């Protein structure tokens, strides 16, 4: 019954989510020019180069930018630069949707491909400048780069209506964040042939991923970032030098930016500030923006920030990224897409020398926007008596209002989901109250649930949720020290010391970042990092204490566990070192030699490879060896346990948890592996304290474990922002032909590894001293997490309804709701219930 209530609550949250993230309504059909003002296109060819995650300062700031050719062109006026604001969610798919259709993306676009009225994942049937170029202007389009474009505009064999947008194409995979070299070379290798065949295409689109991958891997100030800037700059130079730039418009843009950790998806200034540059010889004859005209030099030297002052990433003129859509449409004389919310960039109007033509273009943009306002603005019939600047200002106001009202909530689903959540939570509380007496532990549980529930009504509390769990965990340890003599404090002091180290390991929360966190210090000292990792892996894999058994048969089983865990730990360490080498990180020479020797053993014809290539080649096979061995050993262990009828369930669960811990370390970033050493210390000490001082109080163990699940999730770098989702370990052992569901599961395991570790914490106490059946023990241990989660859920759903027009509804509350869904389904059901049920059945 309790499990059914948990599933029902998850369904209620999903129902609410369907109402909160509804499919966005779009206008059907395609726009057409009114034909009243005939004009020729300003340019004949268009080249669009998208550099994924190219933040504005990467292009314009003297302290970081290496785009030397772009700087030359900005200085002589043949390049016009802008800071392009990209609306959140700042991930590639919704941003490409905005860049091509001019529409504001729904937040759900960051999670579900593209959800439109026809429930299709493509934009083939929706109006876009690509559709206009292809169908109304007869342009031939070629594309090479991020295969997200091919999801939006699938080739003919992938769609039923036999439409296709690209005459020639090749996609590169966008999620192998470890690769920032080959992924770009796979795009660049097409350029020479395209330059030879300029008569056979009109539009060329290139989308480079390497810079984004460097950001994810090593942050915006990585040592690889400068060379990548220069590589991208050389590509622009090559295109510019070999194309006819009088008749060609070259647009260089980022689809979004990145934060100071190198991630994106949120709404920080760095994530929403993408660079954009238009290049053509023709532009030199006209005036750029006044901000560019007044700039003294390129790249721009920005004054140092004062203490506490945040970087704005505002360079030159700031525009909306979607403004590129009506601008390109007008310059190439095609209709502005029906669902466009962009406003033509005013500086480009001067390329139309006839003032009446400029007014006609502005009128087209105004009337197109008016079609989206549901009659709130009037269609413009005449162009004689208006001032262009005034109309553009009014269009900006319309744009702002349209962006705010882009989503219509499905209120019936919102209220049904919220009502069900409240009813189910009330039922859970009622059932819990019938079985549990009120004492200090239950009071602490209810207080934590109430505190965390109330906190979701504040946007800052959501952004800094880690602070709550820090004070809760330290408060609980300090409370345990009350009435203890000084000599008994030692173990508590050690726990507090370990907690403080964990607290300072990574940047946590969304408001503040610090340079000197432990993870960054370790990255700067490779010897300390890797020796700590070796010690951690050894401690995790060779924890002899959990392998002590009574009789001869089980002792033999324990010895086999010791060998298996030792082998898995060794492979884990070698793989993490190998992974770091492949990603351009330095490692101690000794460990480099170990990896090289290992690679020579597992790669066929190893003597034919250079050292570097040999290590690269060994990466995926080494990971697959680990996975095969892990699952073979785990299944064998459970079968042997069943065969020999090992009755001590607590010991069996402890051994299984050791195997899973090794797997979690394997899925953890190198700089976070050391956390598990302190997890182990806290685990051993607190289990001893609960057994000795609290007579193995299972409820206290469960509550303490839950707090640590949340606390360590945030202190390992997690937040309530999509920007901190780590993909770097989602592809361990995966080649290009991957299963998205497997990768998704691996991503969840990687990001929630500390949480999964502490979900097993109470097993050693709960099952070792159980006075009731296994199943009654299981249910009793699950109530506290369900109490906390359901309380938070009820409050969060209410907060999303009450604050649905809040300024931060999409940047703070929506990501929190998405994270809550993951906590409910992945952690609350998959992690908390399924493994334990399967183990109890054996």
From Swiss-Prot:
EC assignment: the record states 2.-.-.-
InterPro entries under this entry? Alkaline_phosphatase_core_sf, Phosphodiest/P_Trfase, PIG-G_N, PIGG/GPI7, PIGG/GPI7_C
Query: What residue ranges carry the coiled-coil annotation?
Result: none
Entry's transmembrane regions: 409-429, 442-462, 468-488, 524-544, 554-574, 615-635, 698-718, 740-760, 783-803, 821-841
From the UniProt record, give one GO term of the biological process aspect: GPI anchor biosynthetic process
Q: Does the keyword Kinase apply?
A: no
| Family assignment from sequence similarity | Belongs to the PIGG/PIGN/PIGO family. PIGG subfamily.
Protein name (Swiss-Prot/TrEMBL): GPI ethanolamine phosphate transferase 2
Q: Which organism was this protein described from?
A: Candida glabrata (strain ATCC 2001 / BCRC 20586 / JCM 3761 / NBRC 0622 / NRRL Y-65 / CBS 138)
Q: Which gene encodes it?
A: LAS21
């Amino acid at each position: 019954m309790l499990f059914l209530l948990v599933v029902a609550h998850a369904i209620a949250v999903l129902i609410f989510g369907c109402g909160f993230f509804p499919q966005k309504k779009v206008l059907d059909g395609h726009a057409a020019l009114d034909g009243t003002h005939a004009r020729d296109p300003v340019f004949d060819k268009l080249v669009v180069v998208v550099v994924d995650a190219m933040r504005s300062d990467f292009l314009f700031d003297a302290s970081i930018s290496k785009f030397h050719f772009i700087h030359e062109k900005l200085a002589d006026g043949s390049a016009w630069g802008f800071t392009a604001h990209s609306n959140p969610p700042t991930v590639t798919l919704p941003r490409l949707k905005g860049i091509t259709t001019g529409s504001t993306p729904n937040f759900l676009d960051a999670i579900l491909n593209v959800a439109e009225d026809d429930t299709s994942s493509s934009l083939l049937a929706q109006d876009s400048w690509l559709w206009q170029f292809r169908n109304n202007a007869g342009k031939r389009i070629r594309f090479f780069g991020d295969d997200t474009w091919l999801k939006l505009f699938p080739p003919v064999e992938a769609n039923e209506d036999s439409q296709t947008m690209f005459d020639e194409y090749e996609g590169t995979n966008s999620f192998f964040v470890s690769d920032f070299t080959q992924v770009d070379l796979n795009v660049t290798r097409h350029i020479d042939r395209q330059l030879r065949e300029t008569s056979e295409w009109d539009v060329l689109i290139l989308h480079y991923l390497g810079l984004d991958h460097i950001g994810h891997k090593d942050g915006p100030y990585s040592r690889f970032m400068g060379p990548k800037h220069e590589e991208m700059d050389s590509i622009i130079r090559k295109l510019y030098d070999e194309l006819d730039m009088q008749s060609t418009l070259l647009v260089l843009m980022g689809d979004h930016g990145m934060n100071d950790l190198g991630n994106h998806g949120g709404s920080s200034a760095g994530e929403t500030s993408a660079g954009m540059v238009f290049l053509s010889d023709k532009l030199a004859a006209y005036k750029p923006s006044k901000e560019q005209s007044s700039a003294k030099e390129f790249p721009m030297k920005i004054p140092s920030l004062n203490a506490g002052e945040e970087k704005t990433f505002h360079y030159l003129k700031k525009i909306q990224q979607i403004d590129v859509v009506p601008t390109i449409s007008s310059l190439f004389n095609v209709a502005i897409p029906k669902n466009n919310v962009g406003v033509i960039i005013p500086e480009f109007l001067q390329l139309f020398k006839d003032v009446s033509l400029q007014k006609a273009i502005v009128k087209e943009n105004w009337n197109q926007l008016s079609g989206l306002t549901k009659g709130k603005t009037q269609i413009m019939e005449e162009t004689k008596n208006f001032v262009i600047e005034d109309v553009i200002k009014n269009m900006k106001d319309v744009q702002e209002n349209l962006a705010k009202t882009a989503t219509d909530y499905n209120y019936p689903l919102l209220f049904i989901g919220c009502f069900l959540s409240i009813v189910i939570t009330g039922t859970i509380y009622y059932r819990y109250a019938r079985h549990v007496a009120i004492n200090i532990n239950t009071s602490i549980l209810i207080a934590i649930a109430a505190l965390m529930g109330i906190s979701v009504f504040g946007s800052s509390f959501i952004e800094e949720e880690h602070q709550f769990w820090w004070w809760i965990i330290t408060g609980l340890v300090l409370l345990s020290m009350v009435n203890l003599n000084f000599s008994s404090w030692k173990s508590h002091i050690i726990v507090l010391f370990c907690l403080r180290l964990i607290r300072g390991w990574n940047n946590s929360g969304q408001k503040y970042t610090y340079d000197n966190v432990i993870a960054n210090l370790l990255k700067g000292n490779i010897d300390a990092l890797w020796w700590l990792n070796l010690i951690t892996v050894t401690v995790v894999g060779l924890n002899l204490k959990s392998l002590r058994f009574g009789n001869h048969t089980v002792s033999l089983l324990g010895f086999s566990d010791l060998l298996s865990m030792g082998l898995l730990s060794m492979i884990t360490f070698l793989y993490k070192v190998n992974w770091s080498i492949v990603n351009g990180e330095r490692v101690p020479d000794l460990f480099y030699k170990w990896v090289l020797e290992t690679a020579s053993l597992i790669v066929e014809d190893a003597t034919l490879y250079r050292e570097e290539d040999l290590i690269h080649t060994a990466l995926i096979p080494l990971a697959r060896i680990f996975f095969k061995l892990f699952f073979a050993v785990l299944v064998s262990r459970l079968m042997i346990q069943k065969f020999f009828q090992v009755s001590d369930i607590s010991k069996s669960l402890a051994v299984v948890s050791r195997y899973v811990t090794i797997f979690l370390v394997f899925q953890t970033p190198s700089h976070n592996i050391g956390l598990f050493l302190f997890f182990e210390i806290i685990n051993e000490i607190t289990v001893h304290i609960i057994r000795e001082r609290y007579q193995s109080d299972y409820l206290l163990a469960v509550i303490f474990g839950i707090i640590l699940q949340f606390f360590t999730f945030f202190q390992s770098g997690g937040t309530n922002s999509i920007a901190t989702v780590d993909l770097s370990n989602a592809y361990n052992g995966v080649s290009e032909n991957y299963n998205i569901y497997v990768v998704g599961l691996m991503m969840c395991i990687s990001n929630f590894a500390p949480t999964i570790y502490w979900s097993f914490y109470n097993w050693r106490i709960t099952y070792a001293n159980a006075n009731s059946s296994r199943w009654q023990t299981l249910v009793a241990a699950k109530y506290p997490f369900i109490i906390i989660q359901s309380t938070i859920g009820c409050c969060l759903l209410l907060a999303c309804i009450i604050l649905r027009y809040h300024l931060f509804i999409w940047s703070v509350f929506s990501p929190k709701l998405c994270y809550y869904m993951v906590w409910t389904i992945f952690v609350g059901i998959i992690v908390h219930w399924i493994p334990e049920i399967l183990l109890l059945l054996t």
